[in-house]
Amino acid sequence: MKIATIFLLEFLFSFSLFGQSNNGLLQITHLTGDFYIFTTYKNYQGTPFPANGLYLVTDDGVVMIDSPWDTTQFQPLLDSIKLKHNKDVVMCIATHSHEDRTGGLNYYRQKGIKTYTTEQTYQICKAKGENLAEYIIQKDTTFKVGQYFFETYYAGAGHSPDNIVIWFEKNKVLYGGCLIKSVEANDLGNLSDANTKEWPKTIKKIQGKFEAPNYVIPGHQNWTDNSSLDHTLQLLKQHNK
């Protein structure tokens, strides 16, 4: 009886810990295979607004793409990943210079996680006195972590001058970050650093390079509809007319 009671308490404790990853502050959703989407929230125009990131579980640790927008969720995300997969995050890539992508770079660097941005993102963050990555991606690069290969790609300006996408060839997952607008979006969102004239060209280059993705992940809102690239072009057409 004592052993059974201890087991039950341990189970409930573990369930409680992982339950924190779906309490409204941090949501983790399985995408496919070893891919997971994490979503956190911040107030945008007076309303809680979701920001998406991705992590990939490999034999050599977990790769994180972008960091939580909500700064209180930097550690809970690491804890949830460790609890669910019994693996540590070994790498974090931020896809552009805004805080919903780079906010956790310093925190994760202090945790011994290798942090990366492009040279362009690094220089923008440096000029603004914001979080900096430890490692710089000088050009489009293919990484290998564990059994997975993935590619960073800069197609041009759009939501920001430095926005990149990340392509996971084996599973045909295209992580677009804020360069790609969700089908749920009614407008282009934050345009403070945007280049709306170049943005359509950038999207079309991505469509030409990565054909027929199985999954397309935008930086905000719903990510379950693969027509978000076309939707982004439609929003840009409406904005630019």
Residue ranges and their predicted role:
Residues 63-67, 90-94, 151-152, 217:
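Short catalytic-loop micro-motif centered on adjacent basic/acidic residues
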Residues 23-25, 30-31, 61-62, 69-70, 116-157, 160-230, ...:
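Metallo-beta-lactamase
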Residues 226-241:
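Short, electropositive alpha-helical surface patch
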Residues 1-21:
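Bacterial Sec-dependent N-terminal signal peptides
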Residues 30-77, 165-178:
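Conserved beta-strand hairpin/beta-sheet module of binuclear metal-dependent hydrolase folds
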Residues 59-61, 72-116:
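Active-site metal-binding motif and surrounding structural segment of the metallo-beta-lactamase
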Residues 42-45, 62, 69-72, 97-102, ...:
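Solvent-exposed loop/turn segments at secondary-structure junctions
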